[in-house]
From Swiss-Prot, chain A:
GO CC term, one of those recorded: cytoplasmic exosome (RNase complex)
First-level EC class: hydrolase
Chief localisation class: cytoplasm
Cystine crosslinks: none
Cleavable signal peptide: none
Gene: rrp41
Protein name, UniProt field: Exosome complex component Rrp41
Molecular function in Gene Ontology: 3'-5'-RNA exonuclease activity; RNA binding
UniProtKB keywords: Cytoplasm, Exonuclease, Exosome, Hydrolase, Nuclease
Organism ancestry: Archaea, Methanobacteriati, Methanobacteriota, Stenosarchaea group, Methanomicrobia
SUPFAM superfamilies: Ribonuclease PH domain 2-like, Ribosomal protein S5 domain 2-like
Enzyme Commission code: 3.1.13.-
Keyword Hydrolase belongs to the record: yes
Compositionally skewed regions (Acidic residues) per UniProt: 297-377, 401-471
UniProtKB/Swiss-Prot annotation, chain B:
Record domain S1 motif: where: 59-128
Any Gene Ontology CC annotation: cytoplasm
Limits of the KH domain: 136-194
Name the record gives this protein: Exosome complex component Rrp4
Family according to the record: Belongs to the RRP4 family.
Subunit organization: Component of the archaeal exosome complex. Forms a trimer of Rrp4 and/or Csl4 subunits. The trimer associates with a hexameric ring-like arrangement composed of 3 Rrp41-Rrp42 heterodimers.
Domain of life: Archaea
InterPro entries: Exosome_RNA_bind1/RRP40/RRP4 (IPR026699), KH_dom (IPR004087), KH_dom_type_1 (IPR004088), KH_dom_type_1_sf (IPR036612), NA-bd_OB-fold (IPR012340), Rrp4 (IPR023474), RRP4_N (IPR054371), RRP4_S1 (IPR048565)
A Gene Ontology BP annotation from the UniProt entry: RNA catabolic process
SUPFAM superfamilies assigned: Eukaryotic type KH-domain (KH-domain type I), Nucleic acid-binding proteins, Ribosomal L27 protein-like
Gene name in the database record: rrp4
NCBIfam families referenced in this protein's UniProt entry, alphabetically: PRK04163.1-1
Subcellular location: Cytoplasm
Length: 493, 260
């Protein structure tokens, strides 16, 4: 604005500016995304002779801690001009100007960044101006916007920024150095893609009409810039298309499911067939089952082992107890069974009980989250309890009265509630998988007070609803847990 | 390609009820808030992110590294903006506070489950599960959390293929940390493969691509190995010769020795 050389004409008579642009044209813009490997998101932008490098970090833990906000992320924007970025070496470090630009630029982004999703964190935006040629703050905002998107930070939209100014009494878009220095006004604006203005500054003098006129220009300029930004981002994330494979559709499906915010981490074992064939779309449930089932087998095995070991020891005890058992059995069929179970459990020791409790706890937890998990768990637990079944069978051979019990079973449905309850429980422990379902069906008919039983009833429903899916799980021979993988593992005990 | 890339601010749908992950609603319309792939389901419109940090959610299984041991908590880095807390009571057995560093010390890696995340993002972790344990061997490779589903593959196809082809054990944490264990060369191969997965995450037919990559690498190894082997043999032979000849000379010397 001052000491403009006499012979300098910023705009020629036919409306061309110093660099050959028209009044409503922006300088050529070149953008690269993801240029910094250590940053979460980055962008290098050249706009005319401006060169801007932006790195975005975060969301990350905010330090110092007192700067944290309990309900949202803090956005920190640092605009810095490299000392070599201008003709006369700029004093390094923050200056009044850079602090101000940092502040207004940060405020330009605050409306669009969904900071409330990341409480207690900080999102850092570092802007380095490597070469300045007027309009660096607008260039920096354009670049930051891309870098933020590149960092995967949720935003309501991209921010685009552009300046207009008054040069030789004319309103022009996107001033360059000379125009900025010798023009009459500079008016940077940043806006969302809907045209909502998030930054507006003015340096110089403009009339309201000129501002209106200028804002129209800026809108047009921002639209152009937005298109460039979008194109660059789309290109960055685009899939490099080489071979069009049939797999695409199912793969996408998988992605959807697995990418859902709360999937259980998968540990899937070797399934040779699966590697080759792009499976038929697997429904969510099946997938969930697969994931869920991976969690279970481990403790199932453990439990089985323990039971096997200790059952052998306990068999002798059982034999001696049989006499008592017989007597009681005559009085009431179900009760001795219960006793037997109790004895057994005592013999098996605390560990087993604990194990089972834990198992149940887990079942509940998982139930809350994934019903399938629970189904899986209960079904998979059933087989190992066959051990009980075997012993019972042996006892039944010896004792006719107990044999009779099986005949009574169908009648049991008409018997007292208590008896039924216990019957159901017996079935639960004793039955193999199919029998288990039957038993659960029985259990379903009664409203049982025990949580266990309730659980079973829901399980039964599910079991009836989706037996095919059970089978469809076939190829997915799940799962050896990593803790079993020979080379390593051990739990800390 | 039916994968549509969306960027923040893209209009996804006019039906407000369908708003899903990675979207926001404005003026009764759904817009994307992330860079990612549009995912359209019957009842939900969402965005599958292609970038972004790992934000813990309940029941995620993650790999954490102990950074602080306090009298009743272990504080773990779980590759998220937030640190995780593992309370002693969440350890499978009772632990006195003085023995805590013996069980898990600073720098130890552990597979954990996220037990709870509250609104102020306090992450509570748990170790009470047979699958969860300390990692004593192997290595941890970090990939971008958004690429984790690609490492697992469709229904686990990728991970099972990797296991089969490299003879390694793998555990993929939801937070992008991947634990691998096996022979040194297998681990090396596998981590190369993982890097490749990360780099080419958006390509189609990734599993086949990685399969071929592993095959090629194996071939290269086989080709390169025999050469080394021959070289070794040669040197061995020559060394043996020398020994032999020396031996003979000594014997001859002995024979020629007039004192005998």
């Amino acid at each position: 604005m001052s000491n403009k050389p006499e012979n300098l004409t910023l705009i020629t008579d036919d409306g061309l500016r110093l660099d050959g642009r028209r009044a409503d044209e922006i300088r050529p813009m070149k953008i690269e995304v993801g240029v910094l490997s250590r940053a979460d998101g980055s962008c290098y932008l050249e706009w005319g002779r401006n060169k801007i490098l932006v790195g975005v970090f975060g969301p990350r833990e905010a330090h110092p801690r007192r700067s944290q906000r309990a309900d949202s992320a803090v956005i920190r924007y640092r605009y810095n001009m490299a000392s070599f970025s201008v003709e006369d070496r700029a004093r390094p470090g923050p200056s009044r100007r850079s602090i101000e630009i940092s502040k207004v630029s940060r405020e330009a982004f605050e409306p669009v960044i969904m900071a409330e999703l990341f409480p207690k964190t900080a999102i850092d935006i570092f802007v380095e101006v490597l070469q300045a040629d007027a309009g660096t703050r607008t260039a920096a905002i354009n670049a930051s916007s891309i870098a933020l998107a590149d960092a995967g930070i949720p935003m309501k939209g991209l921010i685009t920024s552009c300046a207009f100014g008054k040069v030789d009494g004319k309103i022009v878009l996107d001033l360059n150095k000379e125009e900025d220095n010798y023009g009459e006004a500079d008016f940077p604006v940043a806006m969302t893609q809907d045209g909502e203005i998030t930054l507006i500054q003015m340096d110089g003098n403009l009339t309201p009409d000129e501002i209106k006129q200028g804002l129209e220009l800026v809108k047009k300029g921002c639209k152009e810039i937005l298109e460039i930004q979008q194109a660059v981002l789309r290109k960055k994330f685009e899939t490099p298309v080489e071979e069009v494979s049939e797999e695409t559709a199912p793969e996408k499906g998988a992605e959807k499911e697995v990418l859902e915010p709360s999937p259980v981490a998968a540990i899937v074992e070797e399934t040779p067939e699966e590697a080759e064939e792009p499976e038929v779309e697997i429904s969510e449930e099946v997938e969930a089952e697969i994931l869920a089932s991976e969690v279970i087998p481990d403790f199932e095995d453990e439990l089985e082992e323990e039971i096997e070991e200790e059952l052998e020891e306990s068999e002798e005890d059982l034999e001696t107890e049989e006499e008592e058992f017989e007597e009681e059995a005559l009085e009431e069929e179900a009760e001795p069974e219960e006793d037997l179970e109790e004895d057994l459990e005592e013999d098996l020791g605390e560990e087993l009980e604990e194990e089972e409790e834990e198992l149940e706890e887990e079942e509940f937890e998982e139930e809350a989250l994934e019903e399938e998990t629970e189904l899986e768990a209960s079904l998979e637990c059933a087989p190992e309890l066959k051990e009980f079944d075997e012993i019972e069978a042996r006892l039944e051979k010896e004792d006719a009265s107990i044999e009779a019990e099986e005949e009574i079973e169908p009648e049991a449905e008409e018997a007292t509630e208590e008896g039924l309850e216990e019957e159901a429980e017996i079935e639960e422990t004793a039955a193999s998988e199919e029998e288990n379902i039957e038993a659960e069906a029985e259990a379903e008919e009664e409203a049982e007070p025990e949580v266990e039983a309730e659980e079973i009833s829901t399980e039964a429903e599910e079991a009836e609803e989706e037996p095919e899916e059970e089978k469809s799980e076939g190829p997915w021979k799940v799962v050896k847990d990593p803790s079993e993988a020979g080379t390593r593992g051990e739990k800390d005990e | 390609m039916d994968k549509k890339i969306v960027i923040p601010g893209d209009l996804l749908s006019d039906d407000v009820k369908k708003s899903g992950y990675g979207t926001y609603v404005k003026n009764d319309k759904i817009y994307s808030s992330l860079c990612g792939i549009e995912s359209l389901k019957e009842d939900k419109v969402g965005v599958i992110p292609l970038a972004g940090a790992y934000i813990p959610s309940v029941n995620d299984v993650v790999i954490g590294v102990v950074i602080v041991v306090t009298p009743s908590n272990w504080i773990l880095d779980i590759a998220a903006p937030y640190d995780g807390l593992l309370h002693v009571s969440e350890y499978p057995r009772r632990v006195e506070s003085r023995e805590m560093p013996e069980i898990l010390d600073v720098g130890d890696s552990v597979i954990l489950r996220v037990r709870d995340v509250d609104s102020s993002m306090k992450i509570e972790l748990a170790l009470r599960d047979p699958n969860l344990h300390k990692l004593r061997t192997g290595q941890i490779v970090e990939v971008e959390p958004v690429k984790v589903p690609r490492v697992i593959g469709h229904g686990g196809s990728m991970i099972s293929m990797l296991k089969k082809e490299t003879n390694c054990s793998i555990f993929v944490g939801q937070n992008g940390r991947i634990w691998i264990d096996g022979k040194d060369e297998d681990i090396e191969l596998l981590s190369k493969a993982l890097r490749k997965i990360e780099a080419e995450a958006q390509r189609s037919g990734l599993t086949d691509r990685i399969y071929n990559f592993l095959k090629n690498e194996r071939m290269k190894e086989k080709e390169s190995k025999p050469v080394e082997f021959l070289k070794n043999e040669k040197t061995d032979v020559s060394v043996a010769k020398e020994d032999h000849s020396e031996d003979i000379y000594r014997k001859i010397d002995v024979l020629l020795d007039p004192k005998n």
